Design a protein with these regions (language model features):
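Substrate-binding clefts and catalytic carboxylate motifs of secreted carbohydrate-active enzymes
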Residues: 1-99
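Flexible loop/turn segments at secondary-structure boundaries
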Residues: 32-37, 113, 206-208
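Low-complexity, Pro/Ser/Thr- and charge-rich linker/hinge segments at domain boundaries
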Residues: 162-183
């Protein structure tokens, strides 16, 4: 999907910008290729128009002359942990920025601000510029939640953001597990007609390897 493509480009570009000794990157075309066959893999269509799933403004949050970055050790956390991640900057603007104001914020899916902070940092023309650490105890997150961590550089008029997921460390007991089956037989159909929950897991070997059976074996 287009959103997955955007996330993949974001991850690749940010990885390049976090690389010490970074000397630039090249994207092999950004629009769909219509000649000698068709490759509908571009961020833009063959006429260099938007496709509707990402805007130039969003794309520039992670592909720009000044980009805030975070080194996340993981994107899924438990609420008995403390989010502690370093903030970095990649700055390749026309000149260095003196006393840049770097503002971070953590919010939930409702847009409610949970925490915020700031750093002041001189930004030379370079990457891997350390700004400081974001530290936030996740103990107040009682239900499975998606949080957004954003970092803004005021003087560069650019901000970047990432989604993380927080789950309770103590799992609730499941009162009644679903019925687990490997085939859709009469017994399964009877349970479904009664309103019961059924988890259908295909048995290893039930699908040919070339049809995805090799992946099925890995799952089991």
């Amino acid at each position: 999907s287009g959103r997955l493509q955007t996330l993949c480009y974001k991850a690749d570009i940010e990885a390049a910008l976090r690389t010490p000794g970074f000397a630039g990157f090249q994207l092999l075309d950004l629009h769909d290729f219509p000649g000698q066959g068709t490759a509908l893999v571009g961020v833009l269509d063959p006429f260099w128009d938007e496709k509707g799933y990402v805007t130039p403004k969003e794309y520039s949050t992670f592909c720009n002359k000044t980009v805030p970055l975070i080194r996340f050790p993981k994107m899924v956390w438990l609420n008995n942990e403390t989010l502690n991640v370093p903030v970095e900057l990649a700055h390749f603007g026309e000149k260095a920025l003196q006393g840049a104001n770097i503002i971070w914020k953590i919010s939930n899916q409702s847009g409610e601000k949970l925490a915020q902070g700031s750093f002041v940092k001189d930004l030379p023309i370079a990457n891997c510029i350390p700004a400081g650490n974001i530290e936030y105890a996740l103990s107040g997150i009682e239900e499975p939640s998606q949080l957004t961590v954003s970092v803004e550089v005021k003087e560069a008029n650019n901000s970047n953001r990432w989604n993380i997921w927080v789950y309770p460390a103590k799992q609730k007991a499941v009162e009644k597990l679903p019925y687990i089956a490997s085939t859709l037989d009469d017994q399964v159909m009877n349970r479904l007609e009664k309103g019961e929950n059924v988890l259908l897991l295909l048995a290893p070997g039930s699908i040919l390897p070339e049809k995805g059976g090799d992946i099925l074996s890995l799952i089991h």
